[in-house]
């Protein structure tokens, strides 16, 4: 949502989700060069995190919300009984420097991290920025983020509202099909 109201990208996402429900076929996922780089570097970052912290990262794929089956997340790993891992491997060295100095990566991905904490029921997430181009001791920026219950409540309400909007679009399209 922007200052002036819902963003165009939100509307586009709702239409995409409605079409996926209607057709049963998922939309192709977009991946740019920076996203590909992040996916390729993630195992290195995970290994560096494990070596630095001594924590063993449990790999996990996709997690659905226990009572809202239209909500799911894919954290980069589970940590112990209460933690998550979210890794970013920025292509920009300046972004990694900012993460080292100000933990900006945790703020930039706040909603993603809070969503992961909400869906998994975990209590905290280590938000990691990793850049192997930096010298030893500066390749990892780790910032621990804890659950923000008011933010999670707002996220839950927004997801429920979005699901109702998607259902309305699907209903409208099904009505058009029956009328034809």
Q: How should these model regions be labeled?
A:
Residues 5, 44-48, 127-133:
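Intrinsically disordered, low-complexity boundary segments flanking structured domains
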Residues 35-57:
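Acidic-basic catalytic patches of nuclease active cores, encompassing PD-(D/E)XK
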